[in-house]
Amino acid sequence: MTPSPIRTATCACGSVELEAVGKPIVSAVCYCDDCQKGARQIQALPNAGPVADPDGGTEYILYRKDRFACTKGADLLKSYKLKQMSATNRVVATCCNSAMFVNFDRGPFWVTAYRARFHGDVPPLQLRICTKFKPAGTALPRDVPSAERYPPLLVLKLLAARVAMLIGR
């Protein structure tokens, strides 16, 4: 049985399409230094659209790796790293330089997709993380809980998703 819903994300020009199946692990905004640097790196590409919000945060939806796939245009995807030896890849659709998702060379069992790439019924934001790194003088909205680092709620959601993967749910 296929978990529902199925959400589709596309690059700005429509040449790359991603599919995420089932309930996401979490929908969050990250303010860490690496996400801010990564957003600037991608935004500096020719014709790239905005990646970070005006307050410096980057909105993501996290999905289990086993429920996330590129269904169109995989040959157009290119990884960008902040440092050559970094395990973190910010994946961009080269056709229009749209930020698509973040994955890792090793480690985490999840994929961090850029929330702005999704269409239709997009899950609402649930929390803001790593807010201690937000730009100086930035006032954050109080629409969802905020945490200076990685809150226990996020860690629990990640652990629950991993257990569900291990037992085949």
Residue ranges with predicted function:
Residues 1-10, 16-169:
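A short Gly-Trp-Pro
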